[in-house]
Regions:
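Membrane-embedded helix-loop-helix hairpins and adjacent transmembrane boundary segments
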Residues: 1-526
Length: 526
C-alpha cells in the first residue's frame, strides 16, 4: 500500500492524544506497595473494570486481525467474540469469585494455591515468554507498520522504540493504576473512533452492500459454516472455541489482572458483564467494516492492512486524526496491559519466592525494573516478526496447542476436589509433550483437520491424565480446597441472597441478557 500524507490538524490531534494519555496515566498512578502497584489497590468499580478489560482485550489481533479476517472470510471471525462472551458469563459465575476471594496476585498463583508450586512455575514461565515475544513484540510491530504508512522513510526500529517509551512512560512509574487510568480514555476513544469509521463505511455504500449479501444468502454473512470450511467450521464453534475462550478470558494474566483489581466480587462480575456487552458490539464496529471493505477496496493482497486502509481512505481531516488516535489507543493499551501483567508474573511468581525477605517497596522496585527489561527485549525482538509472515494466524493456531492442558488443569482444580498437585503437573507436562507431537506430525495424525477440531482431543487427553495420576496420590489437604474449588452449597446460598436484591443489580440477570443476545445474533447470522 502506498503511503498517505496527513495534514497538520491530524498530526496535532495525534500528538495531543499521546501527551494526554501519558498525563492521565501518571496523574493518579503513584504506587508504593505491591497491592497498589500490581492490582491498583483492589479498589476499582465495575465500570472501570469493564472498560479496562475491553481496552486490554482489543489487541492488534482484534482490531487489525479480525477486520482483516472479515475482509477475507466474512463475519465468521466474530464467532471467537461470540463464544468469548458466553465464556465470560461462565468465568464471572464460577471462577472469578474464587480468584478474588483467594487474594491472588497472578493466575499461576491460583494453581499453587490449589495444587503446588510446580504447576505455578510452569504456567507462569509460559506466560512470560509468550507475553514478551508474541504479545508485546507483536503490538509494537503492528503500531510501527501503521506509522510506516504515514512516514515511509522512518526507521522501523526507531518507531518501535518510540512506542515502547510511550507505553513504558506511564506504566512503569505507576503500575496497574496508571495503566487503567490510561485505558479508560483509550477505551472511549476506541469506541467513538470505531463508530465513526463504521458510519463512514455505511455512508459509502456499505449498507446496500450488506443488504445485497443478506438477500443473496452469501456465505460471508453467515456465522455457521460447513464442517469443511477453512475459517471456522461449525463443530469448532462447539468443541474448540470455548476452550480457547476460557484460556483467553479466564486464564490470561493480562486480562484477569483487571478483574482482580475490582473492589469486590460483585463489582468484578458486573465489570465482566459490561466488557461482554462491549465485545458483542465489535460485530458492528470492527467486523462489519471489514466485510464492507471487500466492496470498497477490492483486491488488497494483505488483509491485515484493511483496517488502516479504511481509516486513511474514508475519513476526512480531523476525524482521521481521531481515528488514528483510536488505532494507536488499542495498540498502546494492549502493550501497557501486557507490560504490567508480565512484570507482575515475574515479581510475584519468581522473585518474591527467591527473596522472601523483600518488603512491599522492594517488590515494587523489582516490578519496575522487570517492566523495563521486558519492554527492551520486546522492542529488540519486534522487527524480527516481519520474517514470520502471518503472525496473527500463526499465534492463534499455536494457542490451540498451548491452551487445552492449562484449561484442563483449571477446570479439574475448580470442579474436582480429588484432583491433586501430582495429577495437575502430570497433565500439564503430558499435554505439552502431546501438543508438541501433534504440532510436528499434525498432517500424519490428523490430515487436513482444522486446528479448532484438534483442541478437544488435547483437552480430553489432559483431563484424563490429571484424573488418572491424581488417583496415584492422596487427596489434597482440606486447606488446598478453601476458596479454590466450586461449592454447590455456596452457589445455592448466593442464589438466595441474589433473590433479595433489585434485578438490575443482579449480575445473573445481565449474564442471562448477554446469553440471549448471543443466541439472537447466532440465529440472525446463521
Amino acid at each position: 500500500m502506498n503511503s498517505i500524507a496527513i495534514n497538520f490538524v491530524d498530526c496535532a490531534i495525534i500528538v495531543l492524544y499521546l501527551i494526554f494519555i501519558i498525563w492521565c496515566g501518571l496523574r493518579n498512578g503513584k504506587s508504593s506497595d505491591a497491592g497498589s502497584y500490581f492490582l491498583a489497590g483492589r479498589t476499582m468499580p465495575w465500570w472501570i473494570v469493564g472498560l479496562s478489560l475491553f481496552a486490554a482485550s482489543i489487541s492488534s489481533t482484534t482490531l487489525i486481525g479480525q477486520s482483516g479476517d472479515a475482509y477475507h472470510t466474512g463475519v465468521a471471525v466474530f464467532n471467537y467474540n461470540l463464544t468469548g462472551v458466553v465464556v465470560m458469563v461462565f468465568f464471572a459465575t464460577f471462577l472469578l469469585p474464587l480468584y478474588i476471594r483467594s487474594g491472588i496476585f497472578t493466575i499461576p498463583e491460583f494453581l499453587e494455591r490449589r495444587f503446588d508450586k510446580r504447576s505455578r512455575y510452569y504456567f507462569s514461565g509460559i506466560c512470560i515468554v509468550g507475553n514478551i515475544f508474541l504479545d508485546a513484540a507483536g503490538a509494537l510491530y503492528a503500531a510501527a507498520l501503521i506509522i510506516k504508512l504515514l512516514f515511509p522513510e522512518a526507521d522501523l526500529q526507531l518507531i518501535i522504540i518510540i512506542f515502547a517509551v510511550l507505553a513504558a512512560s506511564y506504566t512503569i512509574p505507576g503500575g496497574l493504576s496508571s495503566a487503567i487510568n490510561a485505558e479508560l480514555i483509550q477505551a472511549v476513544i476506541l469506541i467513538v473512533g470505531s463508530v465513526i469509521l463504521t458510519g463512514a463505511c455505511f455512508a459509502n455504500g456499505g449498507f446496500d452492500y450488506l443488504a445485497s449479501l443478506f438477500e443473496s444468502g452469501d456465505m460471508s454473512v453467515r456465522l455457521i459454516r460447513p464442517l469443511t470450511d477453512t475459517a471456522t467450521p461449525w463443530l469448532g464453534l462447539i468443541v474448540g472455541m470455548p476452550v480457547l475462550g476460557i484460556y483467553f478470558w479466564a486464564n490470561n494474566q493480562t486480562l484477569v489482572q483487571r478483574v482482580l483489581s475490582a473492589r469486590s466480587v460483585d463489582e468484578g462480575r458486573k465489570g465482566v458483564m459490561f466488557a461482554g456487552a462491549l465485545t458483542l458490539a465489535t460485530l458492528f464496529i470492527i467486523v462489519f467494516p471489514g466485510v464492507i471493505a471487500r466492496h470498497l477496496f477490492p483486491g488488497i493482497e494483505k488483509p491485515d492492512m484493511i483496517y488502516p486502509t479504511m481509516v486513511l481512505r474514508l475519513l476526512p481531516t480531523g476525524l482521521l486524526g481521531i481515528m488514528l488516535s483510536a488505532l494507536l489507543a488499542a495498540l498502546t493499551s494492549t502493550l501497557s496491559a501486557i507490560l504490567n501483567s508480565t512484570s507482575t508474573l515475574f515479581t510475584m511468581d519468581f522473585y518474591a519466592k527467591i527473596d522472601k525477605r523483600a518488603d512491599e517497596r522492594k517488590l515494587v522496585r523489582v516490578g519496575k525494573l522487570a517492566s523495563l527489561v521486558i519492554i527492551v527485549i520486546a522492542a529488540l525482538w519486534a522487527p524480527q516478526i516481519g520474517r514470520f509472515g502471518s503472525l496473527l494466524k500463526y499465534y492463534q493456531e499455536m494457542l490451540s496447542y498451548i491452551a487445552p492442558p492449562v484449561v484442563a488443569a483449571f477446570l479439574m482444580g475448580v470442579f474436582s476436589r480429588r484432583a491433586n498437585g501430582r495429577g495437575a503437573f502430570a497433565g500439564l507436562i503430558a499435554g505439552l509433550v502431546v501438543a508438541a507431537a501433534m504440532l510436528l506430525w499434525r498432517t500424519e495424525i490428523f490430515g487436513g483437520m482444522h486446528f479448532l477440531l484438534i483442541v478437544p482431543f488435547l483437552l480430553v487427553f489432559s483431563l484424563s491424565v490429571i484424573w488418572a495420576v491424581s488417583r496415584t496420590a492422596p487427596a489434597p489437604r482440606p486447606d488446598k480446597l478453601i476458596d479454590t474449588t466450586f461449592s454447590a452449597a455456596d452457589f445455592r446460598a448466593e442464589t438466595r441472597s441474589l433473590a433479595e436484591v433489585s434485578w438490575w443489580r443482579n449480575y445473573r440477570v445481565w449474564g442471562g441478557v448477554l446469553l440471549v443476545l448471543c443466541m439472537l445474533i447466532l440465529i440472525i447470522f446463521r
